[in-house]
Amino acid sequence: MGLTVHQLKAKAAEWLLLKVKYPLEYRLSCQRLPELSHQKKIILTLLPGHDNLGDHAIAYASYCFLKKHFPAYDIIEVDMKEIYRLARPLKRSRHPEDIVCIIGGGNMGDLYRYEEWTRQFIIKTFKSYPMIQLPATVHFTETKRGKREERRAIHTYKQHPRLLLMARDQTTYEWMKLHFPDQDVWKQPDMVLSLDESSKDETREGVLLCLREDQEAYLTKEERQQLQQHIQETYDQVGLITTTIGIRVDRTTRLEELTALWTELKQAQVVVTDRLHGMIFCAITHTPCVVLRSFDHKVMEGFEWVAHLPFMTLLKEPNEAAVKEAVHQLMKTSSQKGEEAG
């Protein structure tokens, strides 16, 4: 299936940004940050500037983790757009103990070119720094473009002499071990699982649906509509939420938006989701959750990290009957989930 005119224009605009505008900003940047040169720092970068709260939760959790475990370091947050303009000033202000951390997530691959090409820019630009790729999922499509982008990524990652790679699922871990036998590769959970946003004070009612409508969805549009209708016919109180909220979010507004979403989850008896961070948000808020698979391995393998929680149920082949039964079972035990999670 060919691309529409709108899609072609969007891809052309993205290419111009990544290949012309942003590299020019990098080369022309003359800003100086002398105040940073006297303090060792962790440059936390590839932060999102879009509306996906899952990615913002990763950035927030990464910041909190680094702040807690590396108190002697200043944590400097730099988003995907800023890094092109600030890379040279940051390098000019380098302290001998500086470290670069790239936030994790599901954008390692060819589905999200902006993020992947910016990751490669960071790896090449900060080649002399110790660098950590925080827990990520890789997915390169089985297409000519996907294979080409995979070769390019492998070549770029291999050129960094001190790059620690972290995988948040087994498939990614095996991919990294295969292609980078001489580099350190760790398997670690998604950074958001380091948070605890649980509360025993909330009154829980009804069911919330949090389902994908993008290129990562496993369910078709018709299947989603049928599932929604089925749940609404079975339960009196059914709501719809999403982790992509339709407004741009940055590091100054992310906690407010995340807190609002987490509060909404904590007021539900059961959540049905096919989103990885829908599942993870339920885990950290101790919200009973029926997890449906996504189009790739991300959700099913991500479930490994929360499978021990008694209020989480995974459906590998979701259908109406299976979802209904799973929701029913969790409804019966939702009042005890706080004590069980304990």
What is each of the regions a protein language model found here?
Residues 1-342:
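Active-site anion-handling motifs in enzyme catalytic cores
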